[in-house]
């Protein structure tokens, strides 16, 4: 386990949980004093943020545990489960916003004190921007799916807070239905983000192959290595921070076993240099036993 990976992923999860807790308290106060349905939408979203971030925090801590006898490939899939759980939380909040928005659209109510709502929303907007910037940096360093899902969630919050500012300003100037209309628009965007997040999580749980650019890098490293005649049957997937890479190397028929072993280890080390922490499994094939149609055939 890379200690840097564990430290930054935990820091990002803790930061999100702390911010969600603070914003929830502030937004309850603001909604109570304004009656804004857009602020109610923000309040519900912060409640969902807190539940999702707490789930994320516990799951991330679990996923960082090393492999054991019962989980020989580690616990990385827990990150995908966290992302899937977040998508469910977010979908539920979007449906609630639709119901509330339609009700206030049919019967708009004047806001009591929009200035409080505007001030609170500005605080939420800038603090969430800081969190998203930190999360994006962590994702670039770790490629954590759980933190990436959380980041996408809070990115939608940034847009939502911007929309709420506009809605509150319009309501202040007499556009009474603007509040409800923006709440509905926010609900649509949140639902879209949730569905996209859920799709990515399911694809990871189904062991989707690594991205095309990473697969091409693997192919380039293997085929350019001296002594390798060819390769085939590349299999890749990702679980948490760990990439899994499996392939067959094609070698000269009469190459001594020890030489073949050393060559395979050299290729493995080259792949590990490019993809630190990867789990690489290489099978050596004499080139004469590989059918012509399988030679250099990377797909299964």
From Swiss-Prot:
GO molecular function, one term: cadmium ion transmembrane transporter activity
Reactions the enzyme catalyzes: Zn(2+)(in) + H(+)(out) = Zn(2+)(out) + H(+)(in); Cd(2+)(in) + H(+)(out) = Cd(2+)(out) + H(+)(in); Fe(2+)(in) + H(+)(out) = Fe(2+)(out) + H(+)(in)
Spans traversing the lipid bilayer: 12-32, 40-60, 82-102, 114-134, 155-175, 178-198
Record keywords, A-Z: Cell inner membrane, Cell membrane, Ion transport, Iron, Iron transport, Membrane, Metal-binding, Transmembrane, Transmembrane helix, Transport, Zinc, Zinc transport
InterPro entries: Cation_efflux, Cation_efflux_CTD, Cation_efflux_CTD_sf, Cation_efflux_FieF, Cation_efflux_TMD_sf, CDF_Transporter
Family annotation (Gene3D superfamilies): Cation efflux protein transmembrane domain, Cation efflux protein, cytoplasmic domain
Membrane topology designation: Multi-pass membrane protein
Record-level GO cellular component terms: plasma membrane
One annotated GO biological process: intracellular zinc ion homeostasis
Keyword GTP-binding part of the UniProt annotation: no
Residues spanning the signal sequence: none
Binding of Zn(2+), residues: 45, 49, 153, 157
UniProt cross-references to Pfam families, sorted A to Z: Cation_efflux (PF01545), ZT_dimer (PF16916)
Subcellular location(s) of the protein: Cell inner membrane
NCBIfam families cross-referenced by the UniProt entry: CDF, PRK09509.1
Family label: Belongs to the cation diffusion facilitator (CDF) transporter (TC 2.A.4) family. FieF subfamily.
Subunit architecture: Homodimer.
Function: Divalent metal cation transporter which exports Zn(2+), Cd(2+) and possibly Fe(2+). May be involved in zinc and iron detoxification by efflux.
Protein name: Cation-efflux pump FieF
Annotated organism of origin: Yersinia pestis
Name of the encoding gene: fieF
